[in-house]
Design a protein with these regions (language model features):
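Solvent-exposed, well-ordered loop and adjacent helix/strand elements within mature globular domains
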Residues: 1-108
Length: 108
């Protein structure tokens, strides 16, 4: 179980290149949510949540479903995921969110 939050592709919430995630992929800035990409804290990478891994997220109501790890969070965070969403979705923090790694066959 992890804590989940949302983030937007803006310099204030990312870095100087908000249109590119840590894996090197580029974000569709008109509709970032369509990618269903997440950022993960460094400690979760050691548990198998590495770039390209697909996961099933449950416990966030309308944002539940299949997402892909493509970004990395600031090192100050632990046991946390961040869902890339459109600017129209504001605020959100959920505790005890389940993240299930899907089979290697589901890797992008």
């Amino acid at each position: 179980m992890v804590t989940a939050t949302i983030y937007h592709a803006t310099p204030e919430q990312t870095d100087s290149t908000p249109d590119q995630v840590a894996s090197g992929k580029f974000i569709n800035m008109d509709n970032p949510l369509k990618h269903r990409w997440i950022a993960v804290s460094k400690d979760l990478e050691a548990k198998g949540l590495t770039f390209g891994v697909k996961v099933r997220i449950t416990g966030i109501d309308t944002l539940d479903g299949i997402w892909t790890v493509q970004d990395r969070m600031n090192r100050r965070w632990n046991n946390r995921i961040d869902l890339l969403v459109n600017d129209s979705i504001q605020g959100g923090k959920w505790e005890n969110v389940r993240v299930e790694i899907l089979n290697d066959d589901n890797r992008l």
